[in-house]
Swiss-Prot record:
Homology family: Belongs to the bacterial ribosomal protein bL9 family.
Function: Binds to the 23S rRNA.
InterPro entries in the record: Ribosomal_bL9 (IPR000244), Ribosomal_bL9/RNase_H1_N (IPR009027), Ribosomal_bL9_bac/chp (IPR020594), Ribosomal_bL9_C (IPR020069), Ribosomal_bL9_C_sf (IPR036791), Ribosomal_bL9_N (IPR020070), Ribosomal_bL9_N_sf (IPR036935)
GO MF annotations, alphabetized: rRNA binding; structural constituent of ribosome
UniProt name for this protein: Large ribosomal subunit protein bL9
GN (gene name): rplI
Length: 147
């Protein structure tokens, strides 16, 4: 019997491959555990269409991240804090930067994706790294201004 592997099977092959297996192994183990499907022409065609759709979505997502990276690197994020005799009162953290990006550039960037070694406690322009996804990083310029 021919089966289309849905998931990687250590001793058999990788997902997407069509393999010839014994009927009992294919029916009782692979298909029953959801590791494979019977390789009919319809199933193979649907699998290829699904893979093409997922690849297209991934490409679009990467393009979106690249566009966001260009926008983030082209702009300086301005954050206003109450000034103190030295620096500012309080500090600027990941959540503040994330909220400022949403407000100023309308880009949703989770605070967990902003790599800030320690909170910003002084005025001026600071460079901050942000992970957008799929290995794409942006270097943000954050300007902290005392008001």
């Amino acid at each position: 019997m021919k089966v289309l592997l849905i998931k990687d099977v250590k001793s058999l092959g990788k997902a997407g491959e069509i393999k010839e297996v014994k009927d009992g192994y294919g029916q009782n183990f692979l298909i029953n555990k959801g590791l494979a499907k019977l390789a009919t022409p319809d199933v193979v065609e649907n699998w290829k269409a699904e893979q093409a759709r997922q690849e297209k979505e991934l490409k679009e997502e990467i393009e979106r991240f690249e566009a966001e990276k260009k926008m983030l690197e082209a702009h300086t994020i301005r954050i206003e804090k109450q000034s103190a005799p030295v620096g500012i009162k309080g500090s600027v953290g990941n959540a503040d930067i994330s909220a400022a990006i949403k407000e100023q550039l309308d880009i949703d960037l989770d605070k967990k994706h902003i790599n800030l070694k320690k909170a910003l406690k002084s005025t001026g322009i600071h460079e901050v790294d942000a992970k957008l996804g799929h290995g794409i990083h942006a270097t943000l310029k954050v300007e902290v201004v005392g008001v």
